[in-house]
Amino acid sequence: MNTYDSPYQIGLGDSVNYNFKNYLVLINYIKGETDAKGYTPKSNRTILIDNDDNRVVCDDFTKLRINEEAA
């Protein structure tokens, strides 16, 4: 499985595997970058969502694996 080299490579809606479960990327916060609502995160983190609408936060983008069938 492929991994991301940078948090800038992560796209909304990307199909990823995290802790042996499949998710879609819902939100990708990048340290120091301000979003449209004025929020500036102090660390990188990615919010993932599964098919049952459960959300999970990934604090280390290197643990995300790009699902091959979606690539």
Regions from the language model: what does each represent?
Residues 1-15:
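Mixed-charge, Lys/Arg-rich low-complexity intrinsically disordered regions
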Residues 9-12, 40-44:
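A short, compositionally biased
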Residues 21-36:
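Short beta-strand-centered aromatic/proline hotspots
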Residues 38-39, 56:
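Short, exposed beta-strand/loop patches in secreted or surface proteins that constitute
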Residues 44-71:
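Intrinsically disordered, low-complexity, charged/polar segments
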